[in-house]
Amino acid sequence: MYEKDRLYAAFQKLRIDEKLSYSLGEKAAVNPDGITCLKSTDRSAIYKLLVKKKSGTIPLILKVYKSSREKNAVEINIYSKARSVLGGLLPEIYLIEESNHETWIFMEFVSQIRGQLTFHPKHFKYIIPSVAELHSRTFENKKISDGKWRSWLPVYESETMRKGRKKQIKKTAELLDRALKDERTKDIVKPHYRQISHLLEQKGPDFFPELIQNGSAITHGDLHMQNICTHDASGHEPWDIQFIDWESAKYAPVWFDMTVLVEILIGFRKDWSRHAEDIRTFCVKVYAKEMKKRGFHFETPPMTLYKMAYVQRTLEKGLHTQLRRIFDNRGGELLPYHADKVSQWGRELGL
């Protein structure tokens, strides 16, 4: 993380004011007192800047990527190379600057939905059209999965990713064995252990070929509320959405995004549990309808695909994440939900 003074000195050295003025189409200057660090990790840091223009002061976001690690490279490339395809679904990018083995991206500040309102299931209908729009832009586009983007965009069907899933599932099986002996987890895991461990050992890493058969596109990969932004969440029609934090983006079956957006939130929101079936049915219908509007139809029933995507993602990633969090004393409250749903839907889907 940069101290405010050091960061501002770097702006002066790199002539950032001049470059932003060119991008914004009018004279602009970063206010040295208006620099706030919002978040800093070993991979990146995010700063909010106040930029003075003739027409008034505007907030901007600066994201500093500290290395070219794979996840950073994916997000940097989404912001730099995918703008022509994903325009309108990303924040406006004003400047990309390379500095001392770091990449600095100056972008539009758009407020996260979380914090603008108390989220209610009805609000999904204002977000899902943008998810469908995102997927429709590159749906089954082989120029994306086989073309020049393949050098930086992970492809779910690739041998590299398949090997990664195999490795991850093996780790999940090991954690499940450990969970059966751990006082914190054994009562949660025991009723489902035989079924889930059998699936992990015998059936993976790809449990449902239908997911790939029903279409892939650029997916965000981490559609939680803090990664979904809009300037105005007060309207009663589809919101103008911009997605941020693209480090998990890949060319993958589209239904994974829907299960993260909807089912993971249902798992967290205990107050929604009585209406869970109605909520997911409503969301799946909205998504299928929005994709149909854009000319795309799913051969397999949409609700089946939704459940398949959830089970696949949970077996390859979700269970591992929750078990790891429990063993690291960092939570893991979704473990009972995941174990129960994987068992129930796994049987229902014939696994």
Each language-model region and where it sits:
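Juxta-kinase regulatory segment immediately upstream of eukaryotic protein kinase catalytic domains
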Residues: 1-32
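ATP-binding glycine-rich loop module of kinase domains
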Residues: 47-73
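Conserved beta-strand elements flanking the ATP-binding pocket of the protein kinase catalytic core
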Residues: 50, 91-97
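ATP-dependent phospho-/nucleotidyl transfer catalytic cores
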Residues: 113-125, 142-220, 231-232
